[in-house]
Amino acid sequence: MALYEHVLLARQDISQQQVDALVEQYKGVLEANGGKVGKVESWGLRPLTYRIKKNRKAYYTLVNIDAPAAAVAEMERQMRINEDVLRFLTVRVEEHEEGQSAMLTRRDDRRERDGDDRPRRREGGFDRGDRGDRGDRGPRRPRDNEAGEGA
């Protein structure tokens, strides 16, 4: 049997419990066709880069699969039919990663960071400050509307 990583994007207007039920449904399809499901990671509701079927956000779920190709094909066929599934991607891998995926570790790193590694802004919120005299420029020309001519 081959090893696969499968990422599923579900609609934003269903609940997390419904997403978990979807994953359980597809786990049942895989197991009925002789496959096994390893790690299941829920990445939660995340913004999409662009709209997919009028959705701006989606529930992301990663599933590690050890199954024959026919079982994966049947799962993908059922996902195409389901309206709650926006997108999915199945990739064959040599071995599954141990521990958390890169998406979850990045989120944890972001939570631990205090923000002290960023430079402090000066008062007023602008970082350029006063630019001083621009001696390389001549005197300013009057604008057309300042000279009395209308546009």
UniProtKB/Swiss-Prot annotation:
InterPro entries referenced in this protein's UniProt entry, alphabetically: Ribosomal_bS6, Ribosomal_bS6_sf, Ribosomal_S6_plastid/chlpt, Transl_elong_EF1B/ribsomal_bS6
GO biological processes: translation
UniProt entry tagged with the keyword DNA damage: no
Pfam families according to UniProt: Ribosomal_S6
Keyword Cell membrane attached: no
Keyword annotations of the record: Ribonucleoprotein, Ribosomal protein, RNA-binding, rRNA-binding
Cellular component GO terms, alphabetical: cytosolic small ribosomal subunit
Segments of this protein annotated with the region Disordered: 96-151
A GO MF label: small ribosomal subunit rRNA binding
Matching SUPFAM superfamilies: Ribosomal protein S6
Signal peptide: none
Transmembrane segments: none
Superkingdom assignment: Bacteria
Disulfide cysteine pairs (residue numbers): none
PANTHER family the record matches: MITOCHONDRIAL 28S RIBOSOMAL PROTEIN S6, SMALL RIBOSOMAL SUBUNIT PROTEIN BS6M
Functional summary from the UniProt entry: Binds together with bS18 to 16S ribosomal RNA.
Similarity comment: Belongs to the bacterial ribosomal protein bS6 family.
Protein name: Small ribosomal subunit protein bS6
Source species of the chain: Brucella anthropi (strain ATCC 49188 / DSM 6882 / CCUG 24695 / JCM 21032 / LMG 3331 / NBRC 15819 / NCTC 12168 / Alc 37) (Ochrobactrum anthropi)
